[in-house]
Amino acid sequence: MAECSSMTATELPAKLAEIRDDFLELEEPDRLLLLLEFADELPELPPRYAEHPDLLERVVECQSPVFMFVEVDDDSAVHLYATAPREAPTTRGFASILSQGLDGLSAQEVLDVPDDYPNTIGLTKAVSPLRIRGMTAMLARTKRRLREGTA
C-alpha cells in the first residue's frame, strides 16, 4: 500500500519537483547550503506590500517572524509573497522554496500539492522538526487562503 509521502515527480508541479530533486541529489550538509541559497533568493516584497505591512499575515507557527500574502492575478496564477528576517536563513529558505515553487500555478494546482511536501525535500534530519512544521504551516496557510477565496 502506497503512503502519502511516497509521491512521484509527476504528481508535483514541475518547479516543486525540481526543487525537491535538487535537494535529494545532494549529501545532507550540502542540502543546508542549498537552503541558504534559497534564503538569499527570497524576493523582496512588491512595493504595494512593503509599504502596507498590515496586508501581510503572520505565520505564527514559525519560530521567526514570517509574514506572507497570497494573491491570484487576472490570469488565475497564484503568487506567494513572504518576508522573513535575514537572521533567520532557514525560515527565509523555506519561504523562498514555496514562493518560487508555487509561483504561477493555478489555485487548484497549489491545493493539490501534498501537505507533506516539506517532509520530502530531504531536510528532516538537517533542521529541527519545529522548522519543518513552520514550512508546513506556510503551505497550509497558502492553501487556506485559496480555499477561502481571500487570495
Give names to the regions the model predicted.
Residues 2-7, 11, 151:
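Intrinsically disordered, low-complexity regions enriched in acidic/Ser/Thr/Pro/Gln residues
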Residues 9-52, 56:
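Extended low-complexity intrinsically disordered regions
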Residues 16, 20-24, 71-73, 77-81, ...:
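Mobile acidic interaction elements
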Residues 49-72:
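Structured beta-strand/loop patches that form or line metal/cofactor-binding pockets in enzymes
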Residues 61-65, 75-77, 92-94:
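Short connector loops at helix/strand junctions that flank enzyme active sites
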Residues 79-88, 124-129:
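A short glycine/serine-rich beta->alpha loop
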Residues 94-104:
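Alpha-helical support elements that line or immediately flank enzyme active sites
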Residues 108-113, 117-151:
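C-terminal binding/interaction regions
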